Every structure is written in C-alpha cells, then in structure tokens.
Design a protein with these regions (language model features):
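Unchanged
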Residues: 20-43, 53-104
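Active-site donor-binding loop signature of nucleotide-sugar glycosyltransferases
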Residues: 4, 17, 93
Length: 118
C-alpha cells in the first residue's frame, strides 16, 4: 500500500494505481502506475473486480471505473514511495482496516477483498 501524498484524501492509505494512458490497456497502465509510485516491477496481474467511482480531480468530478487486480510479489521486494505516494509499505492482511483508506472505491475494494480472502 501507499499513503497518499496529494489530494484527494491526502495522508490516507491507498492502493497504488492511477489513470490508463491512451495507448495502454488496463494491465499495462496498472503496472506502469505501480512502478511509478513504488518502484516495483510486477508481472502477471490477475483481474479481481471493478467498482464504479466518482473521482474529484482539479475541481472536477470524473466518473471512473476502478479495476482491481491481484499481484503476487517476492518476499524480499522493497517498495519505495515516489510520484504522488508519500509512503509505501507492506501490511499483512490481518492488519488491514478498510476504514483507513480515504477514497470510497478503494475502501470498498479492500473491504470486499478481505471478506473474500480471510
């Protein structure tokens, strides 16, 4: 996870991610955003689910469809905060609390993932 370094929801927990560029598919965009925010180079994303969202950006409300993927990482991966992430960290599933995630769709996704994987 990362701690958001910018608004909206600055200072709250988040999952690394962002917007897909015009020449990317969802998987490519997600892998690029994770690399930009954490330095991690990951592969083989497994699609989980999507959640419709309203995202506040530059004074505008943008309708988005947030896509969630599961990625497996090596035990010795070190994430480093970069781009718009203020901090990057690993937390065990049993320490996650969906209410610590400041963006509604992310909070709902974490809640759903935890209910399906505990």
């Amino acid at each position: 996870m990362v701690r958001r370094g910018k608004e909206p929801a600055k200072g709250t927990l988040d999952l690394p991610g962002g917007f897909v560029d015009m020449d990317e598919n969802a998987e490519e965009g997600m892998l690029r955003e994770i690399k930009e925010e954490t330095g991690l180079r990951l592969q083989k994303p497994q699609y989980l689910f999507s959640i419709p969202n309203l995202y506040e950006y530059s004074g505008m409300t943008i309708h988005t469809l947030d896509l969630f993927f599961r990625l497996d990482v090596e035990d010795d991966c070190n994430a480093t905060a970069a781009d718009d992430a203020a901090d990057a960290m690993w937390l065990p599933l049993n320490k996650l609390d969906h209410t610590q995630f400041g963006l509604h769709s992310i909070s709902q996704a974490v809640k759903r993932f935890l209910s399906e994987n505990r």
